[in-house]
């Protein structure tokens, strides 16, 4: 089981029913296929259990997990530039004239297509967890762009997907700033020793504190000067550590050893059973964490 490292959280904005059985058929129309010789990138669905199952969905307790795979061709800019310059020089020498800008632009496409079949590929996988009980979708990635790309693939597969980023009633950075300023956090949470503070003004500077007591005069001075906490390392119930960001994303999830070892009694050779048990355990813990976080940060914005 791939334990999630990050969470981008989305709210289903309309009541829609997502069932694994139906999704299995819908995702099958967009399974991953490798790049052809002229493709820059390809994205599609693969089984979340990898080679251990052909199923494109895995479900338990109203929770569904799916996995997107992306292949991107790597063509470094200097390589393209060098090949383009060589082509331009040859044509200009052959024709005895300088090429126009439009001619150079069309040559760039030609060069790109000639290089693509020889380009290296970079592969990445993104797990997505659908919580049908609470109407949430969580994407295991650190960037909004990657999350949106994966959601777009799901939307295309299903026909429609009404989702919006989970919005809170109060600005997250103001709540995080108050937690650091006062040293008092929401119940179940503890401050760790890492934070990022930014000035409200665009060019006012950034402070990154690591391995430092956050409830200190040094940090207080920055807050008094008008900086707000935009990232804050927290511990929840001594079970999960993470960094809360002002955009609502949850990064660098770290599950305690006791939690990760909870299913050690299951034979590792029985991959399917272990995957299922870990999935139930992880989603149960993360659903509780998200609920606690939303409450601690002042509640979800009214829809």
Swiss-Prot record:
UniProt key word Cytoplasm: yes
Keywords: Cytoplasm, DNA recombination
GO MF, one annotated term: double-stranded DNA binding
Entry's Gene Ontology cellular component terms: bacterial nucleoid; cytoplasm
Pfam families per the UniProt record, alphabetical: RdgC (PF04381)
Compartments reported by the entry: Cytoplasm, Nucleoid
Alphabetical list of InterPro entries matching this protein: RdgC
Predominant location category: cytoplasm
GO terms under biological process: DNA recombination; regulation of DNA recombination
Similarity annotation: Belongs to the RdgC family.
NCBIfam families attached to this UniProt entry: PRK00321.1-1, PRK00321.1-3, PRK00321.1-5
Function in brief: May be involved in recombination.
Name of the protein: Recombination-associated protein RdgC
Organism in which the protein naturally occurs: Salmonella typhimurium (strain LT2 / SGSC1412 / ATCC 700720)
Lineage of source species: Bacteria, Pseudomonadati, Pseudomonadota, Gammaproteobacteria, Enterobacterales
Gene name of this polypeptide: rdgC
């Amino acid at each position: 089981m791939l334990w999630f490292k990050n969470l981008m959280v989305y709210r289903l904005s309309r009541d829609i029913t997502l069932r694994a059985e139906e999704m299995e058929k819908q995702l099958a129309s967009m399974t991953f296929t490798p790049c052809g010789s002229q493709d820059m990138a390809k994205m599609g669905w693969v089984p979340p259990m990898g080679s251990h199952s052909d199923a494109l969905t895995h479900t338990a307790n109203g929770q569904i997990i799916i996995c997107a795979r992306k292949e991107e061709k790597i063509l470094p800019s200097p390589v393209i530039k060098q090949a383009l310059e060589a082509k331009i020089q040859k044509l200009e020498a052959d024709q005895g004239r300088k090429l126009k800008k439009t001619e150079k632009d069309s040559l760039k496409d030609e060069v790109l297509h000639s290089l693509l079949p020889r380009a290296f590929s970079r592969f990445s996988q993104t797990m997505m967890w659908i919580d049908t009980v609470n109407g949430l979708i969580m994407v295991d990635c650190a960037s909004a762009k990657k999350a949106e790309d994966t959601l777009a693939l799901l939307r295309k597969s299903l026909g429609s997907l009404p989702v919006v980023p989970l919005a809170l009633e109060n600005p997250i950075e103001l709540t995080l700033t108050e937690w650091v300023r006062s040293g008092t956090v929401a119940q179940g949470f503890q401050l760790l020793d890492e934070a990022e503070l930014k000035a409200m003004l665009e060019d006012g500077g950034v402070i990154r504190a690591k391995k430092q007591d956050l409830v200190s005069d040094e940090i207080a001075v920055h807050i008094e000067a008008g900086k707000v906490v935009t990232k804050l390392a927290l511990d929840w119930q001594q079970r999960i550590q993470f960094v809360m960001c002002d955009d609502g994303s949850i990064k660098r999830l770290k599950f305690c050893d006791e939690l990760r070892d909870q299913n050690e009694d299951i034979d590792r050779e029985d991959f399917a059973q272990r995957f299922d048990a870990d999935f139930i355990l992880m989603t149960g813990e993360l659903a509780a964490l998200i609920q606690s976080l939303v409450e601690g940060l002042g509640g979800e914005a009214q829809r």
